Amino acid sequence: KRDGVTEWPGEGESSVSYHGKPLPYLPYAYRHPEYGRKMQEESKEGKDIVASVNMFRESEKKHPVQEEELIKVENIKGTLILVAAEDDVLWEAAKYVRRMEERLKIHPHECKVEAFVYKHGTHFVFPEGMVKTMLPIGGDLMTRVFAAGRKYPRECKETRIDIERNVTRIIKKWMAE
């Protein structure tokens, strides 16, 4: 903990590195301690255990994403499975999936792309079997940390079942090649 918060952004540094070198990144709109306060406010406002999507939106407003900060998905070899839900309150996962799809339309690539964007599913868009393995006594508990998961439990479960069906189909096809 730092000043009562459990999470804060790095100070002018990337959160991710590759081969020991920091990767380009989108700077957060807020610094510590405002970052933690904004997350708490957003979580409370939406009745979610944790939420930060508005912080990411604000970050992109203050610092439009630059080419060097984008993931070069066109360099990925093999099958790329992109999954997101519109009701993700941690970040705009559906927007990012669409952004990657658009990027692949304009850049030559060899990867096979399977993209799935669901209306409901929350941040935890995992295959249903994986959720049952992680939480055998109540897989639905995972999505209920978010207001959308509590409001749309049936739809979230249907999303997880569909993800399982699609990922299984893709893996079986890949194994048969």
What are these regions (language model features)?
Residues 1-42:
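A catalytic-pocket lid/entrance helix-loop region that shapes and gates access to the active site
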Residues 14-17, 99-103, 134-137:
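Short, low-complexity, polar/charged sequence segments that are solvent-exposed and flexible
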Residues 30, 35-124, 164, 172:
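Serine-hydrolase catalytic core
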Residues 125, 129-177:
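Catalytic active-site module of serine/aspartate enzymes centered on a nucleophile-bearing elbow/loop
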Residues 7-11, 93-95, 127-128:
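Short, solvent-exposed loop/turn and secondary-structure capping segments
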Residues 2-7, 68, 72, 92, ...:
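Poly-acidic low-complexity segments
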Residues 19-24, 106-109, 139-143:
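Glycine-rich loops and low-complexity Gly/Arg-rich segments
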